[in-house]
Amino acid sequence: MYENTGCFTGHRKLPANKIEKILMNLDREIDNFIAQGVTDFISGGAVGFDVIATSLIVAKKEMGRNIRLIFALPCKNQDANWDEKQKALYRDLLNEADEVIYVSEEYSPFCMKRRNQYMVEHSAYCICALLHEKSGTGQTVRLARKKGLKIINVVD
């Protein structure tokens, strides 16, 4: 049912000396997934890797790729504690979405985990930027492995 869907997960803070490699690997892997028939890409909409991946999907859509951007967001006020620049970019990216899903109306201690579960349960592929296993990203990748998703770590 979700064989044409991939999701993104990654850390909010990425080392400056790895960003260029991550970006190049991410661009290549998105193209590889599109070539394999992936048409829908789910982003959790967080600061950091999610924004980078989402921006690439928007750029590829603008270049004529027949793909969809889906946001699976933890709650409606995810950006409440972000700075104005982050909020503006977030709003711009949300405006580019083909679909926006809120897994919870309001923030709760479990809404991020539910968002991550939603992304994994609705995907066949996962592109990650995993540096630390003990993290929300690590938890999402472990769940993706357990569910049998094809996982590509663009940090490697």
Locate each region found by the language model.
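Acidic/glycine-enriched connector segments
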Residues: 1-156
